[in-house]
């Protein structure tokens, strides 16, 4: 971030307003000044771990290094020492629900996504250790609950629950029962962070990952317009996840999938939607608008099936790209042996450079592009909901 921007922010904010913001944004479990900084165990590559302070975490992220924060799961003894071999899942060789998906996709709304994202980014930050982060999660919980309440699914066992964490901001899980306990998961992360001064500066997080958050919320709304899904007649159970604390090292999703492993949950697939709204980088590079299908640290079978989904249900093509180790919450599912995949807004190198700053705002996003991600999400979930996995 450039120094003039910081100075402008400081001059523009009144002392009273800034004091109120800092108060709500201060970490809920802030260490006393005379105590040594708390250290966290991070994993930056398979088998490559190190102890770092919170400030060192942010420095590593500013340098572009991605990691798991495995402190809690390692202490509890729940973390596998190596990546487990994913369970064998036979994803469909062809798409079988084209007519239903295309009919439903016509009901997806850019306006809904815009309105939700405008409200979501109005929070000064969604920093996972702050009171404002709890407030933003509470607002999101209300939107998810309203989405379910407005559908038939509320009468057939669909529900939304919080998954609580020690740092304050909770994760959110919406469940739509199917005829079996085999489960199809779609996720995004709800937290945001300003990587320069997390406890002071604004972190609107429009693209990272407000865009994914509202994309899957809109896909959920339209999915529940299917009577078969809403009434619990799909073959498989469906879950939509909004994780807390992705920015801190995939903390929320690690906790969720750690518990799922302990409970022997039968998770057949997990798709992550993180950063779905920025297309200008691709266009500026002279390339065609597309979605970026991640090819590293993902399940190859699920990824191949997603390519078919994009080709069938989206109006733009896919490109193949890589994002590195522990680059988003799909990695947590993979870390515990569940088949996972990740689709983002573009090739990784063309993705938004405004993330983690005060400039990650709605005005830079393309809601037509987000609509393509919503189509892909809807198509994937609907096809897998009725598949024999």
Swiss-Prot record:
Zn(2+) 2 binds at residues 208, 247, 356. It is an enzyme of class 3 (hydrolase). Zn(2+) 1 binds at residues 189, 208, 274. InterPro entries: M28_fam (IPR045175), Peptidase_M28 (IPR007484). Its main location: secreted. Its cofactor is Zn(2+). Its EC number is 3.4.11.-. GO terms for biological process: proteolysis. GO terms for cellular component: extracellular region. One of its GO terms (molecular function) is metalloexopeptidase activity. The keyword ATP-binding does not apply. It comes from the Eukaryota. It is found in: Secreted. Monomer. Belongs to the peptidase M28 family. M28E subfamily. Extracellular aminopeptidase that allows assimilation of proteinaceous substrates. This is Leucine aminopeptidase 1. It comes from Paracoccidioides lutzii (strain ATCC MYA-826 / Pb01) (Paracoccidioides brasiliensis). The lineage of its organism: Eukaryota, Fungi, Dikarya, Ascomycota, Pezizomycotina.
């Amino acid at each position: 971030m450039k120094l003039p921007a910081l100075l402008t922010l400081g001059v523009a904010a009144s002392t009273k307003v800034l004091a109120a913001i800092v108060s709500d944004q201060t970490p809920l479990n802030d260490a006393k000044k005379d105590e040594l900084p708390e250290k966290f165990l991070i994993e930056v590559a398979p088998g490559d771990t190190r102890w770092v302070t919170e400030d060192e975490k942010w420095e590593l992220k500013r340098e572009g290094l991605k990691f798991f924060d495995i402190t809690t799961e390692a202490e509890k003894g729940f973390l596998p020492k190596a990546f487990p071999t994913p369970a064998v899942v036979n994803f469909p060789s062809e798409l079988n629900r084209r007519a239903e998906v295309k009919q439903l996709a016509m009901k997806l709304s850019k306006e809904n996504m815009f309105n939700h994202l405008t409200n979501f980014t109005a929070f000064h930050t969604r920093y996972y250790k702050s009171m404002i982060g709890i407030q933003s999660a509470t607002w999101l919980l209300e939107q998810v609950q309203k989405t379910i309440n407005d559908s038939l699914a509320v009468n057939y066992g669909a529900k939304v629950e919080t998954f609580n964490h020690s740092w304050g901001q909770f994760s959110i899980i919406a469940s739509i029962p199917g005829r079996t306990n085999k489960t199809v998961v779609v996720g995004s992360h709800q937290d945001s962070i300003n990587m320069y001064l997390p406890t002071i500066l604004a972190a609107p997080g429009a693209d990272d990952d407000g865009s994914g958050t509202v994309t899957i919320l809109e896909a959920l709304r339209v999915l529940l317009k299917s009577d078969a899904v809403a009434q619990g007649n799909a073959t498989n159970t469906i879950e939509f996840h909004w994780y807390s604390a992705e920015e801190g090292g995939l903390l929320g999703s690690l906790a969720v999938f750690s518990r799922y492993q302990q409970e022997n949950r039968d998770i057949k697939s997990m798709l992550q939607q993180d950063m779905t709204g920025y297309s200008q980088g691709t266009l500026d590079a002279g390339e065609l608008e597309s979605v970026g299908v991640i090819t590293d640290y993902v399940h190859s079978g699920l990824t191949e099936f997603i390519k078919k989904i994009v080709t069938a249900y989206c109006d733009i093509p896919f490109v193949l790209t890589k994002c590195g180790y522990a680059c988003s919450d799909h990695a947590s599912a993979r870390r515990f042996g569940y088949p996972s995949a990740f689709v983002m807004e573009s090739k990784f190198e063309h993705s938004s450079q405004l993330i983690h700053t005060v400039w990650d705002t709605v005005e830079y996003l393309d809601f037509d592009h987000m609509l393509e991600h919503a189509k892909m999400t809807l198509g994937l979930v609907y096809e897998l909901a009725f598949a024999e996995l």
